[in-house]
């Protein structure tokens, strides 16, 4: 089941995210956020964009996806940066694709028109997921971050919804 996250999901989301921070280069954070910080992130995303969770058959949070501002400048307000994290053993089961699509649908219904995501290279799973959902490559920052003893490249992909005529309505 996919649903809107609440601050009560913070511990589960923090537990899912921690190995991405400590054991991989997928996240450029170096210290995993504690549940109280994750609760603040959830609340902030819910106020401005969206944060969804994927529950397994037992009702346990098995993944999450969220959108946030692409930039703080006003003319970017219809554009989002999006991210998804699943329990490491849950990848390639179809749940991630359904969760991410639900996030994109939620954000589109709220008036957002452009979705951007960055991924540390190489990351075949993320590249494949984004490609399957219609994202297109827009560029790569070379050696932009240093983690686990090496400089890392970050590729950016973008999904643009069809252009609207006239002035867009404000995202909500």
Q: Over which residues does each language-model region extend?
A:
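Conserved acetyl-CoA-binding loop-helix of GNAT-fold acetyltransferases
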Residues: 92-105, 128-132
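A short beta-loop-alpha structural element at the N-terminal edge
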Residues: 1-13
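Conserved beta-strand-loop-alpha-helix junction that forms the acyl-donor binding cleft
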Residues: 91, 117-127
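Acidic/histidine-enriched, glycine/proline-rich intrinsically disordered or flexible terminal extensions
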Residues: 163-172
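Conserved GNAT acetyl-CoA-binding A-motif
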Residues: 107-119
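Conserved GNAT-fold acetyl-CoA-binding loop/helix
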Residues: 14-41
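Acetyl-CoA-dependent GNAT
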Residues: 32-89, 100-101, 160-162
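Conserved catalytic-core motifs of GNAT/GCN5-like acyltransferases
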Residues: 66-69, 116-119, 131, 136-153, ...
């Amino acid at each position: 089941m996919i649903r809107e996250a609440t601050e009560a999901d913070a511990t589960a989301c923090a537990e899912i995210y921690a190995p991405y921070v400590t054991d991989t280069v997928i996240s450029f954070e170096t210290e995993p956020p504690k549940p109280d910080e994750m609760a603040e992130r959830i609340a902030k995303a819910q106020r401005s964009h969206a944060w969804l969770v994927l529950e397994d058959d037992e009702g346990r949070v098995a993944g999450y996806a969220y959108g946030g501002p692409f930039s703080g400048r006003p003319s970017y307000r219809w554009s989002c940066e999006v991210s998804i994290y699943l329990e490491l053993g849950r990848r390639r089961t179809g749940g991630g694709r359904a969760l991410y699509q639900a996030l994109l649908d939620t954000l589109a219904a709220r008036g957002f028109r452009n979705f951007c995501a960055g991924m540390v290279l190489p990351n075949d799973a993320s590249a494949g997921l984004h490609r399957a959902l219609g994202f297109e490559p827009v560029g790569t920052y070379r050696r932009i971050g240093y983690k686990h003893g090496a400089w890392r490249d970050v590729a950016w992909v973008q999904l643009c919804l069809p252009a609207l005529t006239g002035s867009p309505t404000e995202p909500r």
